């Protein structure tokens, strides 16, 4: 939360070479870009779904090529040499951006924190896992002022080690190295973040100006932050360090802190530990008039080569630097780990003051402590200072007891900060099986751990026998398909959570999710558990099958049967190796955010859902990591299989449900059907025979979008063609296997 929230800009210069700019800091107005580009389809039709969202990182954009294997390259890396080089950079001040106290540690901590800290629990977006801080809008957020300099300082290291270390890993690793170089013992570190090569469209907020808040709060008088946002303010990581909407109220700020850190999966103790620990190092920057700070990197003149916020206040750097507009040094030891942040926080009474840039902050009252805080460049000593949000840790009952305890027990703070910092840096990386490097600690509860395989796996003969038992069990194709989808369809590609591995469909909270039809699971799971138990009790050589594997295998057997019933023999690939997690290794509260509000693949939406269903379908497809064609074929196939939630007939455009046919597409595109909104059922459409007026089908927007949206209609036409019935089956099976294996990182 070390929030150097800086300067912004007014309208852009009219010529490419014009370098003058005006800016305001710390209150930053919106950029006003001028563009001669033609209007896009989204400009003309903003409510139309954008299928291109499902293809955010095309292979052609990757200069390393499709065959590049980051894990293979990383294995060649000398991580100790890398750490030594990062620390060397950190302790070698550069004239073009001089280091406070001769050490860039505070800057690097902030860079890593602000990369990882964009993570949000409601949709798993954000985080440092792809190196997105290099690109717009994050590289130009007001909260990220001067982090462009931090990344430039690291360029010699990246240049030296090349493909063996990604930018995503290096940005996060640098902050970890900073802590260690200043005497802090970290909990561990994992590499494994792969770079992307272009920005991704993420809804960070609907405000059209920096530091805006009006669109993310409902205006009902309640300060209830809308989902899925993780920050109170457009362009900030968490909260305004001057207080809500710049009002210096530490108690109100504490409420915002709790909400935003909670949306990053941090509890109160973890939140307090991160703030205290992070603010034990470095300083903020607000040396003078913020109007003298130039435009952000994306708006800076071309000759600045991607560096932004050039300041004409004095030298613009070092003692004259302006970043957040706040001028705070928290401790007398800003390059050393100790307990002086809390000793300072509780050792003085505080009064509200303003920085040289006009930002609200607190200073020790009545001149107390004058001269005890060192100047970063050898000038006269300073008075103790704190952010409004620092005072929250003392004044708010939410955090007071926690920080008071740490004042007397610094070893507890060190342990809490080490674990919270590790969680911050790795929250978006998924299972430990994805982690690389020698410093990976034991799996933590928040990482949704699954036990290792400790037995021989089933072979092809076992798989065939188990399929026969499943199909002879009395369970129907829709039941088996829906159960497998309920397990695997919980996966989120954003933060690599959910999925079938772990068998958590049988555990709380997933067992009772409305989307998963608990009453149906109560029928299906006991049957599968009996098959599992019988096999494990009788199999030779100690072979076993987990329920997680059997759920997927059963769904795949149902798909094979459905394809056969449609006239196609096909084998659905199955890779055993999933294991069953325990309820004790499942954080119920943490998993609750994975519960789907809607799943268009099952034609499910919670009652009263107001968002357009087709948009929610697209979002679910995005989270699953499927493409436009894969989304299309999956919806059509699942409708044919009768896999709708609650057995609904919406979108089941076939007279032979349970067979894997392309009837959904054929009948959707039939011009003999005329569609209209139902007069009796909300969010339902009726398809009537155009000649007789007889009711033929019912549907939701999840179905009709494949005939309405021009891109999806083009895909639907492919699968409706007479010569593509076999292709439809093959493509459905391939997409099905992809979803079933999304969380099988051991296979990738």
Swiss-Prot record:
UniProt-listed Enzyme Commission number(s): 1.11.1.21
Q: Which InterPro entries match?
A: Catalase_peroxidase (IPR000763), Haem_peroxidase (IPR002016), Haem_peroxidase_sf (IPR010255), Peroxidases_AS (IPR019794), Peroxidases_heam-ligand_BS (IPR019793)
Q: Read off the PROSITE patterns from this record.
A: PEROXIDASE_1, PEROXIDASE_2, PEROXIDASE_4
Catalytic reaction(s) noted = H2O2 + AH2 = A + 2 H2O; 2 H2O2 = O2 + 2 H2O
Q: Where is this cross-link: Tryptophyl-tyrosyl-methioninium (Tyr-Met) (with W-113)?
A: 238-264
Give the cofactor binding note.
Answer: Binds 1 heme b (iron(II)-protoporphyrin IX) group per dimer.
Annotated site residues (Transition state stabilizer) in this chain: 110
Q: Which UniProt keywords apply?
A: Heme, Hydrogen peroxide, Iron, Metal-binding, Oxidoreductase, Peroxidase
At which residues is the cross-link Tryptophyl-tyrosyl-methioninium (Trp-Tyr) (with M-264) found? 113-238
* Function summary: Bifunctional enzyme with both catalase and broad-spectrum peroxidase activity.
Spell out the protein name for this chain. Answer: Catalase-peroxidase
Q: Which gene encodes it?
A: katG
């Amino acid at each position: 939360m070390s929030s150097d929230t800086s300067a912004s800009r007014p309208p852009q210069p009219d010529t490419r070479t014009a370098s003058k700019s005006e800016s305001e800091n710390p209150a930053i107005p919106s950029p006003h870009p001028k563009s001669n580009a033609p209007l896009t389809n989204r400009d003309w039709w903003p409510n139309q779904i954008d299928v291109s969202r499902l293809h955010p990182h095309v292979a052609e954009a990757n200069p390393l090529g499709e065959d590049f294997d980051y894990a293979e390259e990383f294995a060649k890396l000398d991580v100790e040499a890398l750490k030594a080089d990062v620390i060397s950079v950190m302790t070698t001040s550069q004239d073009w951006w001089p280091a406070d106290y001769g050490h860039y540690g505070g800057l690097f901590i902030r860079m890593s924190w602000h990369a990882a800290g964009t993570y949000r629990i409601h949709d798993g977006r954000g985080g440092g896992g792809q190196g997105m801080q290099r690109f717009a809008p994050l590289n130009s957020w007001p909260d990220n002022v001067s982090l462009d300099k931090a990344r430039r300082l690291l360029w010699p290291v990246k240049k030296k080690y090349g493909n063996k270390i990604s930018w995503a890993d290096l940005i996060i690793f640098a902050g970890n190295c900073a802590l260690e170089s200043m005497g802090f013992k970290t909990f561990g570190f994992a590499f494994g973040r792969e770079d992307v090569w272009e920005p991704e469209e993420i809804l960070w907020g609907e405000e059209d100006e920096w530091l805006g808040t009006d669109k993310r709060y409902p205006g009902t008088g309640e300060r209830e932050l809308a989902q899925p946002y993780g920050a109170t303010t457009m362009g900030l990581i968490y909260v305004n360090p001057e207080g809500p909407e710049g009002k210096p109220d530490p108690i109100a700020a504490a409420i915002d802190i709790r909400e935003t850190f909670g949306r990053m999966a941090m509890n109160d103790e973890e939140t307090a530990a991160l703030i205290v620990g992070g603010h034990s190092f470095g300083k903020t920057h607000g040396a003078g008039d913020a109007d003298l700070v130039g435009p952000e990197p994306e708006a800076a003149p071309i000759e600045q080569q991607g560096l932004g916020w050039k300041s004409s206040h004095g030298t613009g750097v070092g003692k004259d630097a302006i970043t957040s507009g706040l001028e705070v040094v928290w401790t007398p030891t800003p390059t050393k780990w100790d307990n002086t942040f809390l000793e300072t926080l509780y050792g003085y009474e505080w009064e509200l003051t303003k920085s040289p840039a006009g930002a609200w902050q607190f200073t020790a009252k009545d001149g107390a402590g004058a001269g005890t805080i060192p100047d970063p460049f050898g000038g006269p000593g300073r008075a103790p200072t704190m952010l409004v949000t620092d005072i929250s840790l003392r004044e708010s009952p939410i955090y007071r007891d926690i920080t008071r305890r740490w004042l007397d027990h610094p070893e507890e703070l060190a342990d809490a900060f080490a674990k919270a910092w590790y969680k911050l840096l790795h929250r978006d990386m998924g299972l430990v099986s994805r982690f690389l490097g020698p410093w990976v600690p034991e799996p933590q509860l928040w990482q949704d751990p699954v036990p290792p395989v400790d037995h021989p796996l089933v072979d092809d003969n076992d798989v065939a026998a188990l399929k026969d038992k499943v199909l002879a069990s009395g369970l129907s194709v829709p039941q088996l398909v829906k159960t497998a989808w309920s397990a695997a369809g919980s996966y989120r590609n954003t933060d690599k959570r959910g999925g079938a591995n772990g068998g958590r469909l049988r555990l709380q909270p997933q067992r009772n999710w409305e989307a998963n039809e608990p009453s149906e699971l109560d029928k299906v799971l006991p049957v599968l558990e009996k098959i599992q138990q019988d096999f494990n009790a009788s199999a030779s050589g100690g072979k076993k099958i987990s329920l997680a594997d059997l759920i997927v295998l059963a769904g795949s057997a149902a798909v094979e049967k459905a394809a056969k019933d449609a006239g196609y023999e096909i084998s659905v690939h199955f890779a055993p190796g999933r294991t069953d997690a325990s309820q004790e290794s499942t954080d119920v509260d943490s998993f609750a955010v994975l519960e789907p509000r809607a799943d268009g693949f099952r034609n499910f939406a919670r009652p009263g859902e107001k968002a357009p269903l087709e948009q929610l379908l697209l979002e679910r497809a995005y989270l699953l990591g499927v493409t436009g064609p894969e989304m299309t074929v999956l919806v059509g196939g699942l409708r044919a299989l009768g896999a709708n939630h609650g057995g609904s007939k919406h979108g089941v455009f076939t007279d032979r449900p349970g067979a894997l046919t392309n009837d959904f597409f054929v009948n959707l595109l039939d011009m003999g059907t005329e569609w209209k909104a139902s007069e009796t059922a909300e969010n339902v459409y009726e398809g009537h025979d155009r000649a007789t007026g007889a009711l033929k089908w019912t549907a939701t927007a999840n179905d009709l979008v494949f005939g309405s949206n021009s891109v999806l209609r083009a895909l639907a036409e492919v699968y409706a063609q007479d010569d593509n019935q076999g292709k439809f089956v093959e493509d459905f099976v391939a997409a099905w296997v992809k979803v079933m294996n999304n969380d099988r990182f051991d296979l990738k």
